[in-house]
């Protein structure tokens, strides 16, 4: 198994410096990860830094709270793609889901899907804040809205990916969508366990350590 191609090599910290982003890009080139995941302000820089490789540029929309309007999320998506993004990780409107406003949750996702054109859209459900039933419902809504992936977590809330959540999400969406586990893999064994549970991507800042068989510091 080429585990490197499961990994979105991630740096989303608000205080990330250019030299840290450059290090992320260098590691991505060396290890051939699926993508780098960076904040929108770094997308153009990342695209240039990955020219000549097959590493994709992933960015985040409505991040990390998901509480911006659908129009803002759509604008963020379009601008990110103009700047070179290949993949969009968007955060759902968690408050709307919790309030039972499922129509808003679905239309919010659909707004990003439509703005993305042919680019990949991953829907962050922030599983740590949801009941199992809410996880099932929002995965179904993401599927209905035409998204490509469901993703467990932002890494900025109360918890990251769990095996139980990845298993439930995979059971819900079947084989039609990708499932991304984010914020829970700190070792090769962790990453492998998520893949075996049904994850097709792993979002982590510890990609290099994982591939080296080391235990990473940090929680994303």
UniProtKB/Swiss-Prot annotation:
Pathway: Carbohydrate degradation; 2-deoxy-D-ribose 1-phosphate degradation; D-glyceraldehyde 3-phosphate and acetaldehyde from 2-deoxy-alpha-D-ribose 1-phosphate: step 2/2. Its EC number is 4.1.2.4. The keyword Hydrolase does not apply. Gene3D superfamilies: Aldolase class I. It comes from the Bacteria. The keyword Metal-binding does not apply. Coiled coil: none annotated. CDD domains: DeoC (cd00959). The active site is at residues 89, 151, 180. It is found in: Cytoplasm. Signal peptide: none annotated. One of its GO terms (molecular function) is deoxyribose-phosphate aldolase activity. GO terms for cellular component: cytoplasm. Keywords: Cytoplasm, Lyase, Schiff base. One of its GO terms (biological process) is 2-deoxyribose 1-phosphate catabolic process. Its main location: cytoplasm. Belongs to the DeoC/FbaB aldolase family. DeoC type 1 subfamily. PANTHER family: DEOXYRIBOSE-PHOSPHATE ALDOLASE (PTHR10889:SF1). Catalyzes a reversible aldol reaction between acetaldehyde and D-glyceraldehyde 3-phosphate to generate 2-deoxy-D-ribose 5-phosphate. This is Deoxyribose-phosphate aldolase.
């Amino acid at each position: 198994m080429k585990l490197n191609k499961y990994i979105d090599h991630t740096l989303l910290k608000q205080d990330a410096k250019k030299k840290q982003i450059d290090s992320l890009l260098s590691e991505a080139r060396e290890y051939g990860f699926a993508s780098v995941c960076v904040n929108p302000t770094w997308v153009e820089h990342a695209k240039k830094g990955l020219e000549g490789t097959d590493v994709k540029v992933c960015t985040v929309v409505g991040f990390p709270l998901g509480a911006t309007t659908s129009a803002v999320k759509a604008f963020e998506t379009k601008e990110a793609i103009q700047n070179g993004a290949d993949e969009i990780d968007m955060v759902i409107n968690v408050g709307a889901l919790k309030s039972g406003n499922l129509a808003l949750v679905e239309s919010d996702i659909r707004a990003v899907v439509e703005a993305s054109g042919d680019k990949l859209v991953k829907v962050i459900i922030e599983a740590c804040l949801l009941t199992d039933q809410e996880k099932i419902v929002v995965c179904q809504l993401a599927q209905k809205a035409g998204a490509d992936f469901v993703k467990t977590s932002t890494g900025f809330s109360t918890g990251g990916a769990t095996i139980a959540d990845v298993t439930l999400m995979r059971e819900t969406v079947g084989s039609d969508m990708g499932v991304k586990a984010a914020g829970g893999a700190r070792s090769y064994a962790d990453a492998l366990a998520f893949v075996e549970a049904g994850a097709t991507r792993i979002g982590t800042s510890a990609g290099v350590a994982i591939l080296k068989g080391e235990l990473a510091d940090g929680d994303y």
